[in-house]
Curated annotation (Swiss-Prot):
GO terms for molecular function: GTP binding; GTPase activity; metal ion binding. This is Developmentally-regulated GTP-binding protein 2. Mg(2+) binds at S76, T96. One of its GO terms (cellular component) is cytoplasm. The gene is DRG2. It catalyses: GTP + H2O = GDP + phosphate + H(+).
Amino acid sequence: MGILEKISEIEKEIARTQKNKATEYHLGLLKAKLAKYRAQLLEPSKSSSSKGEGFDVMKSGDARVALIGFPSVGKSTFLSLMTSTASEAASYEFTTLTCIPGVIEYKGANIQLLDLPGIIEGAAQGKGRGRQVIAVARTADVVIMMLDATKGEVQRSLLEKELESVGIRLNKHKPNIYFKPKKGGGISFNSTVTLTQCSEKLVQLILHEYKIFNAEVLFREDCSPDEFIDVIVGNRVYMPCLYVYNKIDQISMEEVDRLARKPDSVVISCGMKLNLDYLLEMLWEYLALTCIYTKKRGQRPDFTDAIILRKGASVEHVCHRIHRSLASQFKYALVWGTSTKYSPQRVGLTHTMEHEDVIQIVKK
């Protein structure tokens, strides 16, 4: 029996098993086996030597955004509107066959936008260009899931299921579980909270399925067996996702209002160029970027060339971005902006910078 058949059998078994206290260990084991087989399926096959055109895209700019969606939902049109890149757009499926990068210039930052080939159902099993598409999607900072507003719910649940099965967790945080395999001493299990979904016995069963008999496990939050399996496997990617409903000009106002109120969702129309500016604002928020401007002594700040860093970056991060040896020569910095009590304020390396702050670094 091949891996796909085994996965199918386990999925059927999970679907027909009632969820209750008596079956929780059985379900936990099935989920562990399922995660194991899916991980095997995603390992690159040794026989495939051809890399495939247009997939080894070099990361450039200050952030990377992956544009994911079914064929013909408007991804190529969106890329053409947002960037200067022309991605072939047509009203038939599979127009985009390779990964097309473009750059959005927004608030002084260069954001790389990747138009990935339309994901089809079964991409996790390597159908279409699925496996390559997913490999590129895992390197992104944010995912924009482009959906057709006329059939958005069906597309959304299918795509979420596909991405979930390849280890991409959307709008979730990493489970707060400490896990460390050891050479001996058996399994040490502790928790700092009351567990309602996992027990010590279930944790041991899951670990034994992965041939782990000696480990230290500490639950710092109430997690499900699935989340514990994610911690064991370790190759999961947790990233923010914006659900973008395109073609809202083809649905009723009531439906537009319902979709717009959903969490992490934006409604747009590429054809009529509606709400694209709001989408950019939301994208900036999800990327959590900060622009920092530099100033030389006795000169005006340079507002043409910003340093782009993650929100919460410190003066030390700014030093490393300018030059790797600058932090070791650092004496103090003068900062103008919202992060200071008064301008300019003399600060040290640990001072947290805010958006559009101006900094002047003084060396020893």
